[in-house]
Design a protein with these regions (language model features):
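Generic non-transmembrane alpha-helix signal with a bias for helix starts/N-cap capping motifs
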Residues: 248, 434, 518-519
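Intrinsic-disorder/low-complexity loop/linker signature
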Residues: 23, 32-33, 119, 499, ...
Length: 531
């Protein structure tokens, strides 16, 4: 969410930090409650010396994973983003472009983007108010305030002041939990979705903000059904592949269309008084205590409370990750915030669908060392699913490697993340993963390199591995070679314990001829996963 840039809100290091963006220098400083950015660039007139402009930091966006910063342009209330963002867990500045999965060199960030776009969901009732000389933007509240979910509160405040109110009285406020599952979910869907509006509606938004209010029918305000050919935000069958599209997935799920599942089936916006988790832990996903593990699913699918019934269905031990409903039916096949995110379209894993869409198969996101043929056979044996027609590579090479080596940038990012995911590591082992993460350290996409380096440090032997994913290419390639060397110097015995599906031969050597062949097949089209 967007907040005023106060000491409490700002998490980035502004203690006399200097950052470089090509031939432009940014000097960050902090005094009292004020944060400043001094921008020095070559003189635009061609004269010697530098042009220097100092602006305050007025707004921040983000508080869990990364944080962006905005400064006024001097054109009304228009703001422009600092071309760097702060990674909170890593405690470091990176170029903003490097924090997004987009083609190298795509650095465009026009002034006014916050006013005309981000204001929609990172504030409460944001109104761009675009004019010929800039924006005169206004908000009811920065961040996600009460009225974002409960609607306008004036009548409620007046009513509660005027008289004693009985429990069954009309409180003149929207309570999402008392709405139908469709209308309750639409409140979340006003932001957690991809949608379209007409040109006329967009013009109206730029002057008046969106007219939708909680409790209204969102379907009358925005179009959520559209062609799946929408850049790269969707897999080819229409399933969302980026974050902030959870409502799109939910409304296509049978649990929503045929049942009464809503966002509130799993999530709660106010931490319960009896929730013993630290507030920060709850706030990360805002899950109900009752929604952890399989408890959210067995609210309806009550038969699976019986562990015998559960294991007969999953063919996995009851307490294992393979018996966790969401690992099979809501796998991490969406991308956002430099990580993989669970899909919110509940699906049944089918090999044929994975092949047709390119969406990684849930089974192979845990069993990283297994082939599509292995998965296909198990699903046929257990559930009677029709077997798919598989290529020779799909029958002999681990599916994870096909996605990580020859897949598009989005697939490579997802697999780099899963190679660092503990449930997958516990099942598949880690001795063979190092070479493939090393390979991704030389990927042309910043985000893929970052995720790969983070996963690599979670593998034994790489805990202290030093690598800068935004260093010059020569340094990155040297880092990739160092990472590969660490693996090659480990005992041959450890490397030989893996089967041929992960392309390690009987001598414990990587089958580089096959890896190079897969690299030649890589889907290297420019791809931008807009979050």
């Amino acid at each position: 969410m967007t907040q005023l840039a106060t000491n409490e809100a700002v998490v980035g290091d502004f203690d006399n930090v200097t950052l470089h963006d090509g031939d432009v220098t940014y000097k960050l400083s902090h005094k009292g409650e004020n944060f400043w950015v001094q921008r020095e660039s070559p003189n635009s007139s061609g004269a010697s010396g530098l042009e220097s402009v100092t602006r305050p930091v007025s707004l921040t966006t983000g508080s869990h994973h990364m944080q962006a910063y905005w400064s006024p342009t001097g054109r009304g209330r228009e703001v422009v983003i600092l071309p760097f963002m702060y990674l909170i867990e890593e405690q470091r500045w990176i170029p903003r472009a490097a924090g997004l999965l987009q083609p190298p060199g795509n650095r465009s960030e026009p002034p006014g983007r916050w006013n005309g776009n981000c204001i929609r969901c990172h504030t409460t009732h944001g109104v761009p108010r675009k004019g010929p000389s800039g924006y005169d933007s206004q908000v009811a509240e920065f961040g996600i305030g009460c009225e974002a979910c409960h609607g306008p509160g004036h009548r409620h405040v007046t009513r509660m002041k005027d008289r004693v109110v009985a429990a069954d009285d009309d409180l003149a406020i929207i309570n999402p939990s008392r709405l139908s599952h469709q209308r309750a979910s639409q409140i979340c869907g006003q932001c957690h979705s991809v949608w379209y509006i007409t040109t006329g509606e967009h013009i109206d938004f730029l002057q008046n903000g969106f007219r939708y209010r909680p409790g209204d029918d969102l379907a009358k305000a925005r179009l959520h059904d559209f062609d799946a050919d929408d850049g790269y935000r969707f897999w080819s069958d229409g399933m969302a592949r980026v974050s902030a599209t959870e409502y799109n997935g939910l409304r296509e799920s049978a649990c929503y269309k045929q049942g009464k599942m809503s966002c509130l089936s799993c999530h709660q916006m106010h931490q319960a008084d009896d929730d013993s988790r630290p507030s920060a832990e709850w706030a990360n996903d805002q899950l109900q205590v009752e929604a952890t593990g399989n408890r959210a699913c067995v609210q309806c699918h009550q038969e699976y409370q019986d562990q015998t019934v559960l294991t007969a269905h999953t063919h996995h031990a009851p307490a294992s990750s393979g018996s966790n409903c969401v690992n099979c039916h809501m796998p991490h096949t969406a991308y956002g915030l430099l990580k993989a995110i669970r899909s919110h379209q509940i699906e049944i894993p089918i090999v044929r669908v994975s092949r047709e869409t390119g969406r990684p198969m849930a089974c192979n996101l845990c069993h990283l060392d297994k082939t599509m043929a292995w998965t296909d056979q198990h699903l046929a044996d257990w559930y009677g699913t029709e077997k798919a027609e598989l290529t020779a590579d799909e029958q002999s090479i681990a599916a994870s490697l096909l996605w990580a080596v020859r897949g598009d940038a989005g697939q490579r990012a997802l697999l780099a993340w899963h190679m660092g995911w503990k449930p997958a590591q516990d099942i598949s082992g880690t001795d063979w993963i190092g070479p493939y993460l090393s390979l991704l350290l030389d990927d042309r996409y910043d985000a893929v390199r970052f995720i790969a380096s983070r996963s690599l440090r979670g593998i034994p032997g790489y805990e202290k591995f030093q690598y800068d994913f935004v260093a010059p290419q020569s340094a990155r390639r040297a880092g990739s070679a160092r990472a590969m060397n660490i693996w090659e110097t480990r005992s041959a015995k450890a490397r030989q314990e893996n089967d041929r599906a992960v392309l390690i031969d009987a001598a414990g050597q990587i089958q580089m001829d096959t890896v190079r062949r897969l690299l030649l097949l890589r889907d290297d089209r420019d791809i931008g996963l807009l979050e």
